[in-house]
């Protein structure tokens, strides 16, 4: 079911310029890895959510399966930077992608951080064998 958006707000996840208990849903795509302070971001998200509000954060993650993990690692360390260099002339930017995924906390740590910083429940939806994950947090208030 598609629900039309009433208002869309773009802003700093570490300092959301909205009153408390103001929004129904927060969505974020491929940004968690780039935030400097995950606990603060989750505190801000939970602060602005209305009761029963939900946050959905899609990001690239590391597979847990050892075979997928090694294949994913090799793909990110060799193929992605090479293709980035060939098509964009920028090896370094695409190397950053691999590094940011490697340094990103595990899904369990993300879920625990959500629950320690304002979310009453947090769960993950694993996609493509763990190459991407949607983190879903709910605030009851």
Task: Give residue ranges: language-model regions.
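A short glycine-rich, Lys/Arg-flanked "PGG" loop and its adjoining helix->strand segment in the class I
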Residues: 39-54
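C-terminal alpha-helical "lid/dimerization" subdomain adjacent to the S-adenosyl-L-methionine
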Residues: 58-113, 117, 123
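Core SAM-dependent methyltransferase catalytic element
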Residues: 111, 115-141
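A short acidic, Gly/Pro-enriched loop at the edge of an enzyme's catalytic core
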Residues: 14-26
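Conserved SAM-binding strand-loop segment of SAM-dependent methyltransferases
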Residues: 2-16
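A short SAM/SAH-binding and catalytic strip from SAM-dependent methyltransferases
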Residues: 24-38, 61
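Conserved Rossmann-like nucleotide-binding pocket used by diverse enzymes
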Residues: 9, 27, 56
């Amino acid at each position: 079911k598609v629900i039309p958006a009433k208002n869309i707000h773009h802003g700093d996840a570490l300092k959301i310029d909205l009153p408390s208990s103001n929004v129904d849903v927060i969505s974020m795509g491929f940004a968690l890895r780039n935030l400097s302070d995950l606990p603060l971001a989750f505190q801000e998200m939970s602060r602005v959510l209305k009761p029963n509000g939900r946050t959905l954060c899609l990001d690239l993650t590391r597979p847990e399966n050892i075979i997928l993990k090694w294949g994913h690692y090799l793909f990110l360390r060799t193929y992605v930077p090479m293709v980035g260099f060939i098509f964009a002339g920028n090896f370094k930017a695409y190397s950053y992608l691999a590094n940011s995924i490697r340094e990103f906390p595990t899904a369990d740590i993300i879920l625990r951080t959500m629950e320690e910083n304002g979310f009453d429940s947090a769960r993950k939806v694993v996609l493509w064998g763990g190459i991407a994950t949607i983190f879903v947090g709910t605030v009851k208030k």
